[in-house]
Swiss-Prot record:
Residues 1-25 are annotated as: Disordered. Residues 31-94 form the S5 DRBM domain. Residues 9-24 have a biased composition (Basic and acidic residues). The N-terminal domain interacts with the head of the 30S subunit; the C-terminal domain interacts with the body and contacts protein S4. The interaction surface between S4 and S5 is involved in control of translational fidelity. It comes from Thermobifida fusca (strain YX). PANTHER family: MITOCHONDRIAL RIBOSOMAL PROTEIN S5. This is Small ribosomal subunit protein uS5. It holds the Pfam family Ribosomal_S5_C. Coiled coil: none annotated. It comes from the Bacteria. Gene3D superfamilies: 3.30.160.20, 3.30.230.10.
Length: 200
């Protein structure tokens, strides 16, 4: 009788890792996955040092949904898989207009500060690695950013998430100000939004 393949041995597991790097399918939905940081952790025990790995992962659908997860395991693939699952549990929706954010916003976490500003279509994502990972997974294609304070990827990612969670929808801003939507959102952004809805 043939022995069952060991967990973590090549073949199918290697293929799974490749799928995670480029995006995976979950119940018919294709997700974008970005590994922001992998860190090796050493724990001192009686017999010596025991190593494990942590993975900071961002997952999104590229259409306004994004989440961040942190996984820990004895092997890198397992740590990434745990991070992906946690990120999916932490999904939240990001208000967008076209391919950019609705208004300027700032997020903070510990000593990390991230400033996000709307940008015109064609600008691209002007951001460093950790911030870029979150924005691209959320489906934001045009934005200006600035990171201040801590350069720790965990703080930067959490600050970016805090900024995105504090965004308001265009309709909410217009209602608070008692103005029509056209007076709150610049015309190019409204056109980009209409084109995105029409699939242009």
């Amino acid at each position: 009788m043939a022995a069952a393949p060991r967990r973590g041995a090549g073949g199918e597991r290697r293929s799974g890792r490749d799928d995670r790097r480029g995006g995976s399918a979950d119940k018919g939905v294709s997700y974008i996955e970005r590994v922001v940081k992998i860190n090796r952790v050493a724990k001192v025990v009686k017999g010596g040092r025991r190593f494990s790995f942590t993975a900071l992962v961002v997952v999104g659908d590229g259409n306004g949904m994004v989440g961040v997860g942190y996984g820990k395991a004895k092997e890198v693939p397992a740590a990434i898989a745990k991070g992906v699952e946690e990120a999916k549990k932490n999904f939240f929706r990001v208000p967008r207009i076209g391919g950019t954010i609705v208004h300027q916003v700032q997020g903070e976490d510990a000593a990390g500060v991230v400033l996000l500003r709307p940008a015109a279509p064609g600008t691209g994502v002007i951001a460093g690695g950790p911030v870029r990972a979150v924005l691209e997974c959320a489906g934001i294609h045009d934005v200006l950013t600035k990171s201040l304070g801590s350069s720790n990827p965990i703080n930067i990612v959490r600050a970016t998430v805090a900024a995105l969670k504090s965004l308001s929808r265009p309709e909410e801003i217009a209602a608070r100000r008692g103005l029509p939507l056209e007076d709150v959102v610049p015309a190019p952004m409204l056109r980009a939004r209409a084109e995105a809805k029409a699939g242009v």
